[in-house]
Amino acid sequence: MFDLKSKCALLTISDLSNFQSYDNLIVKPLIGLGWECEFIPWDSTSVNWDDFDAVIIRSTWDYQQKEKLFFKTLQSIEASSATLYNSLDIVKWNINKRYLLELERENISIIPTRLYDSFDFEIVSDLFSFFNENKLVIKPCVSANADDTFILEQSKMENLKSVLEGTFSRKDFLVQPFIKNVESEGEYSLIYFGNRLSHVLLKTPKDGDFRVQEEHGGILKTINKPESSLIDFGNKVMGTIPYQCLYSRVDVVRGSDNYLLMEVELIEPSLYFNMDPKSPQMFAEVFNKWHG
Protein backbone atom coordinates (compact mmCIF):
# COMPACT_ATOMS: atom_id res chain seq x y z
CA MET A 1 0.00 0.00 0.00
CA PHE A 2 1.40 3.37 -0.98
CA ASP A 3 1.79 6.13 1.60
CA LEU A 4 0.27 9.15 -0.14
CA LYS A 5 1.80 12.29 1.32
CA SER A 6 0.33 15.74 0.99
CA LYS A 7 2.38 18.14 -1.11
CA CYS A 8 3.23 21.70 -0.15
CA ALA A 9 4.86 24.37 -2.31
CA LEU A 10 6.84 27.09 -0.57
CA LEU A 11 6.93 30.17 -2.79
CA THR A 12 10.31 31.87 -3.01
CA ILE A 13 12.48 33.68 -5.56
CA SER A 14 15.02 32.17 -7.91
CA ASP A 15 18.01 33.87 -6.26
CA LEU A 16 18.16 34.32 -2.48
CA SER A 17 21.87 35.10 -2.40
CA ASN A 18 21.28 38.70 -1.28
CA PHE A 19 18.74 37.77 1.39
CA GLN A 20 18.56 35.99 4.73
CA SER A 21 15.89 33.29 4.64
CA TYR A 22 15.20 30.68 7.31
CA ASP A 23 12.28 28.87 5.74
CA ASN A 24 14.37 25.72 5.33
CA LEU A 25 13.88 25.24 9.09
CA ILE A 26 10.19 24.38 8.64
CA VAL A 27 10.81 21.61 6.11
CA LYS A 28 11.77 18.89 8.61
CA PRO A 29 8.76 19.53 10.90
CA LEU A 30 6.45 19.51 7.89
CA ILE A 31 7.93 16.24 6.64
CA GLY A 32 7.39 14.81 10.11
CA LEU A 33 3.69 15.62 9.78
CA GLY A 34 3.40 13.87 6.43
CA TRP A 35 4.12 16.68 3.99
CA GLU A 36 6.37 16.73 0.96
CA CYS A 37 7.85 20.21 0.51
CA GLU A 38 9.21 21.94 -2.56
CA PHE A 39 10.59 25.47 -2.87
CA ILE A 40 9.31 27.04 -6.08
CA PRO A 41 10.15 30.49 -7.51
CA TRP A 42 6.86 32.35 -7.56
CA ASP A 43 7.32 33.53 -11.16
CA SER A 44 8.04 30.07 -12.55
CA THR A 45 5.94 29.43 -15.66
CA SER A 46 6.09 25.63 -15.70
CA VAL A 47 4.21 24.75 -12.51
CA ASN A 48 0.93 22.88 -12.36
CA TRP A 49 -0.52 24.09 -9.07
CA ASP A 50 -3.01 21.22 -9.08
CA ASP A 51 -0.03 19.00 -8.20
CA PHE A 52 0.00 20.57 -4.72
CA ASP A 53 -2.39 20.44 -1.81
CA ALA A 54 -1.15 23.71 -0.33
CA VAL A 55 0.98 26.68 -1.36
CA ILE A 56 2.56 28.92 1.30
CA ILE A 57 3.86 32.34 0.30
CA ARG A 58 7.31 32.73 1.78
CA SER A 59 10.37 34.56 0.47
CA THR A 60 8.82 36.22 -2.60
CA TRP A 61 10.91 39.30 -1.94
CA ASP A 62 10.89 40.83 -5.40
CA TYR A 63 7.14 40.81 -6.00
CA GLN A 64 6.90 44.60 -5.73
CA GLN A 65 8.94 44.85 -8.94
CA LYS A 66 6.44 42.66 -10.83
CA GLU A 67 3.21 43.26 -8.96
CA LYS A 68 0.82 42.39 -11.80
CA LEU A 69 2.60 39.11 -12.49
CA PHE A 70 2.58 38.32 -8.77
CA PHE A 71 -1.18 38.72 -8.63
CA LYS A 72 -1.56 36.62 -11.78
CA THR A 73 0.41 33.81 -10.14
CA LEU A 74 -1.65 33.96 -6.96
CA GLN A 75 -4.87 33.99 -8.97
CA SER A 76 -3.70 30.85 -10.79
CA ILE A 77 -3.01 29.16 -7.47
CA GLU A 78 -6.40 30.07 -6.05
CA ALA A 79 -8.08 28.81 -9.22
CA SER A 80 -6.34 25.45 -8.79
CA SER A 81 -7.13 22.68 -6.32
CA ALA A 82 -4.35 23.92 -4.00
CA THR A 83 -5.07 26.11 -0.97
CA LEU A 84 -3.09 29.35 -0.81
CA TYR A 85 -1.72 30.66 2.50
CA ASN A 86 -2.17 33.46 3.16
CA SER A 87 -5.13 33.84 0.84
CA LEU A 88 -5.38 36.16 -2.14
CA ASP A 89 -7.95 38.28 -0.30
CA ILE A 90 -5.44 38.82 2.50
CA VAL A 91 -2.72 39.73 0.00
CA LYS A 92 -5.01 42.26 -1.71
CA TRP A 93 -5.83 43.87 1.64
CA ASN A 94 -2.25 43.91 2.91
CA ILE A 95 -0.22 44.76 -0.19
CA ASN A 96 -0.99 48.49 -0.06
CA LYS A 97 -0.11 50.30 3.14
CA ARG A 98 -3.41 52.17 2.99
CA TYR A 99 -4.61 49.45 5.36
CA LEU A 100 -2.85 51.40 8.13
CA LEU A 101 -5.56 54.05 8.01
CA GLU A 102 -8.21 51.35 8.22
CA LEU A 103 -6.60 50.01 11.39
CA GLU A 104 -6.30 53.53 12.77
CA ARG A 105 -10.07 53.86 12.40
CA GLU A 106 -10.30 50.76 14.61
CA ASN A 107 -8.40 52.63 17.35
CA ILE A 108 -4.98 51.16 16.60
CA SER A 109 -2.22 53.69 17.25
CA ILE A 110 -0.14 54.06 14.10
CA ILE A 111 2.71 56.34 13.14
CA PRO A 112 1.00 59.49 11.81
CA THR A 113 0.66 58.90 8.08
CA ARG A 114 -0.16 60.95 4.99
CA LEU A 115 -0.92 59.12 1.74
CA TYR A 116 -0.52 60.49 -1.79
CA ASP A 117 -1.10 59.19 -5.30
CA SER A 118 1.06 61.80 -7.04
CA PHE A 119 4.29 63.51 -6.07
CA ASP A 120 4.43 67.24 -5.44
CA PHE A 121 7.74 68.48 -4.05
CA GLU A 122 6.21 71.51 -2.34
CA ILE A 123 3.45 69.51 -0.66
CA VAL A 124 5.93 66.97 0.68
CA SER A 125 8.25 69.76 1.84
CA ASP A 126 5.38 71.33 3.79
CA LEU A 127 4.97 68.15 5.83
CA PHE A 128 7.94 69.05 8.03
CA SER A 129 5.85 71.82 9.56
CA PHE A 130 2.65 69.73 9.41
CA PHE A 131 4.23 66.99 11.53
CA ASN A 132 6.43 69.45 13.45
CA GLU A 133 9.44 67.21 12.80
CA ASN A 134 12.84 67.76 11.21
CA LYS A 135 13.04 64.21 9.79
CA LEU A 136 10.46 62.39 7.69
CA VAL A 137 10.20 58.96 6.08
CA ILE A 138 8.87 58.53 2.55
CA LYS A 139 8.21 55.13 0.96
CA PRO A 140 5.95 53.50 -1.62
CA CYS A 141 2.57 52.19 -0.53
CA VAL A 142 3.58 48.89 -2.14
CA SER A 143 7.08 48.03 -1.01
CA ALA A 144 9.29 45.43 0.62
CA ASN A 145 12.79 45.23 2.11
CA ALA A 146 12.90 49.02 2.61
CA ASP A 147 13.15 49.44 -1.18
CA ASP A 148 12.79 53.09 -2.25
CA THR A 149 12.56 54.22 1.37
CA PHE A 150 14.18 57.56 2.16
CA ILE A 151 14.86 59.63 5.26
CA LEU A 152 14.12 63.26 4.46
CA GLU A 153 15.77 66.18 6.23
CA GLN A 154 14.42 69.65 5.58
CA SER A 155 17.83 71.20 4.99
CA LYS A 156 18.70 68.56 2.36
CA MET A 157 15.41 68.32 0.49
CA GLU A 158 16.55 70.28 -2.55
CA ASN A 159 19.40 67.81 -3.10
CA LEU A 160 16.90 64.93 -3.30
CA LYS A 161 14.31 66.63 -5.48
CA SER A 162 15.15 64.89 -8.76
CA VAL A 163 15.58 61.49 -7.06
CA LEU A 164 12.24 61.77 -5.27
CA GLU A 165 10.43 62.93 -8.39
CA GLY A 166 11.89 60.05 -10.37
CA THR A 167 11.04 57.49 -7.68
CA PHE A 168 7.52 58.55 -6.75
CA SER A 169 6.13 60.17 -9.90
CA ARG A 170 4.21 57.02 -10.87
CA LYS A 171 3.45 55.29 -7.58
CA ASP A 172 1.37 55.81 -4.48
CA PHE A 173 3.46 56.70 -1.47
CA LEU A 174 3.22 57.62 2.17
CA VAL A 175 5.04 60.10 4.38
CA GLN A 176 5.50 59.73 8.13
CA PRO A 177 7.53 61.47 10.81
CA PHE A 178 10.74 59.61 11.56
CA ILE A 179 10.43 57.92 14.96
CA LYS A 180 13.72 58.41 16.79
CA ASN A 181 13.27 55.24 18.84
CA VAL A 182 13.89 53.19 15.69
CA GLU A 183 17.52 54.27 15.97
CA SER A 184 17.84 54.37 19.77
CA GLU A 185 15.83 51.27 20.74
CA GLY A 186 14.81 49.47 17.58
CA GLU A 187 11.70 47.91 16.10
CA TYR A 188 9.78 45.04 17.70
CA SER A 189 8.38 42.17 15.66
CA LEU A 190 5.65 39.98 17.14
CA ILE A 191 5.18 36.78 15.16
CA TYR A 192 1.91 34.86 15.20
CA PHE A 193 0.90 31.49 13.79
CA GLY A 194 -2.85 31.43 13.56
CA ASN A 195 -3.80 33.73 16.41
CA ARG A 196 -1.10 32.33 18.70
CA LEU A 197 1.93 34.44 19.55
CA SER A 198 5.06 32.44 18.74
CA HIS A 199 7.99 34.74 19.49
CA VAL A 200 9.06 38.36 19.78
CA LEU A 201 12.28 39.96 18.61
CA LEU A 202 13.90 43.36 18.60
CA LYS A 203 15.54 44.55 15.39
CA THR A 204 18.03 47.40 15.62
CA PRO A 205 19.78 49.18 12.74
CA LYS A 206 23.53 49.35 12.40
CA ASP A 207 25.20 52.61 13.35
CA GLY A 208 24.42 55.37 10.89
CA ASP A 209 21.45 53.57 9.31
CA PHE A 210 17.71 53.46 9.96
CA ARG A 211 16.87 50.15 8.28
CA VAL A 212 16.49 47.17 10.60
CA GLN A 213 16.55 44.39 7.99
CA GLU A 214 19.48 41.97 8.23
CA GLU A 215 20.25 42.62 4.57
CA HIS A 216 21.05 46.22 5.57
CA GLY A 217 23.11 45.30 8.62
CA GLY A 218 20.28 45.14 11.16
CA ILE A 219 20.84 43.18 14.37
CA LEU A 220 18.27 40.72 15.76
CA LYS A 221 17.66 39.88 19.41
CA THR A 222 15.05 37.50 20.81
CA ILE A 223 12.94 39.05 23.58
CA ASN A 224 12.20 36.16 25.91
CA LYS A 225 10.13 38.21 28.36
CA PRO A 226 8.40 40.96 26.37
CA GLU A 227 6.50 43.64 28.25
CA SER A 228 2.87 42.77 28.82
CA SER A 229 1.88 46.10 27.26
CA LEU A 230 3.71 45.12 24.06
CA ILE A 231 1.91 41.77 23.91
CA ASP A 232 -1.41 43.47 24.62
CA PHE A 233 -0.80 45.90 21.78
CA GLY A 234 0.12 43.12 19.37
CA ASN A 235 -2.96 41.13 20.34
CA LYS A 236 -5.14 44.21 19.84
CA VAL A 237 -3.74 44.65 16.33
CA MET A 238 -4.38 40.99 15.56
CA GLY A 239 -7.95 41.38 16.74
CA THR A 240 -8.61 44.16 14.23
CA ILE A 241 -7.25 42.39 11.13
CA PRO A 242 -10.35 41.51 9.08
CA TYR A 243 -9.03 38.06 8.10
CA GLN A 244 -7.83 34.86 9.72
CA CYS A 245 -4.17 34.40 8.80
CA LEU A 246 -1.90 31.38 8.99
CA TYR A 247 1.04 33.66 9.72
CA SER A 248 1.31 37.30 10.73
CA ARG A 249 4.07 39.65 11.78
CA VAL A 250 3.22 42.81 13.69
CA ASP A 251 6.00 45.42 13.56
CA VAL A 252 5.90 47.96 16.38
CA VAL A 253 7.95 50.90 17.63
CA ARG A 254 7.77 52.63 20.98
CA GLY A 255 6.38 56.15 20.71
CA SER A 256 6.66 58.95 23.25
CA ASP A 257 3.87 57.54 25.43
CA ASN A 258 2.61 54.35 23.77
CA TYR A 259 3.41 51.72 21.17
CA LEU A 260 2.84 52.58 17.52
CA LEU A 261 2.11 50.18 14.70
CA MET A 262 4.61 50.37 11.87
CA GLU A 263 3.28 47.60 9.65
CA VAL A 264 1.34 44.35 9.67
CA GLU A 265 3.12 41.87 7.42
CA LEU A 266 0.78 39.19 6.06
CA ILE A 267 2.22 38.40 2.63
CA GLU A 268 5.87 37.34 2.70
CA PRO A 269 7.34 38.40 6.04
CA SER A 270 10.46 36.80 7.38
CA LEU A 271 9.14 34.83 10.34
CA TYR A 272 12.62 34.49 11.86
CA PHE A 273 12.42 30.77 12.55
CA ASN A 274 16.11 31.00 13.48
CA MET A 275 15.34 33.16 16.50
CA ASP A 276 13.17 30.66 18.38
CA PRO A 277 13.97 26.93 18.29
CA LYS A 278 10.35 25.96 18.94
CA SER A 279 8.88 28.12 16.20
CA PRO A 280 9.42 25.79 13.18
CA GLN A 281 7.53 22.95 14.86
CA MET A 282 4.80 25.31 16.07
CA PHE A 283 4.35 26.70 12.57
CA ALA A 284 4.16 23.21 11.06
CA GLU A 285 1.57 22.07 13.60
CA VAL A 286 -0.63 25.14 13.16
CA PHE A 287 -0.43 24.82 9.38
CA ASN A 288 -1.23 21.11 9.50
CA LYS A 289 -4.25 21.75 11.71
CA TRP A 290 -5.47 24.59 9.49
CA HIS A 291 -5.16 22.54 6.34
CA GLY A 292 -6.66 19.44 7.91
Model-derived regions, located:
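A short glycine-rich, hydrophobically flanked beta-strand micro-motif that places a catalytic Asp/Glu
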Residues: P41, V175-P177, C245-S256
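Active-site nucleotide/adenylate-binding loops and adjacent lid/helix of ATP-dependent enzymes
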Residues: F2, S6-T12, L74-A79, L88-E185, ...
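A short beta-strand motif that forms the metal-chelation/ATP-contact edge
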Residues: F52-I57, S189-Y192, N258-S270
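Conserved N-proximal alpha/beta basic substrate-recognition cap immediately N-terminal to
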Residues: S14-D117
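Phosphate-binding site of ATP-dependent enzymes
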Residues: D147, E153-M238, V253, L260
